[in-house]
Amino acid sequence: KKNTTIGEGTHVASLKDGIDANKFYNNKKKDSTDDTTPKAVTNYNSTMTELNYNDKAEYTVKVDKEGLYYLNLDYISIGESLSDYTVKLAVNGKQQYSEMNTIALPIIWADEDTKTYVGSDKKKSFPLDSYGDEIAPSQNRVQEWTNTYLHNNTYVSSLPLSFYLKKGVNKITIENVSSGGLAVGKLQVEAGKDNTKSYKEYASEHSNAELVKDSADALQVDA
């Protein structure tokens, strides 16, 4: 049975065994072999944890109403991966649908030279090739804390994935199923939204629409 009940409120989940970002960075730098963790990881005021391949982060959150919720996650790339991260998610030990197996956490890229905007209209100046034609600038990976709603990696919908939470305490597990060097932080749970319009609302919005009377203009569908 499909659950369509919408949850209520915004809640911050608690991260099991989370560590202060500055402490994490200092611990990494004590290992002389580590030279990839960016200083930007310390620009964070919540607890965090590192997820290498198949590592899991466990969160608990209490909600006052059962229903559908969006999940909003902070993350940062602290390794050398050039590909988007993929994580798998479970709620109370279960996966509610297959899309929870492949949730995307994108790597962020920016132009190598970010100071090439000129004029009040913010027009960008692109590098030129030997023929004087504009070419795409080189890209750098941005290693900063990023906040995102959780989407499946196919992005079949512009809306985030919805997760059913029971009333009371829920355990949310996030597993890294891609490359190492991923760190995650605060997980926020927000009530989902029902954007489905009723027939009455839809009809009211299109009350002035012209009916198709010519069969040549009619759209035929198989039902």
What residue ranges belong to the model's regions?
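Extracytoplasmic
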Residues: 1-223
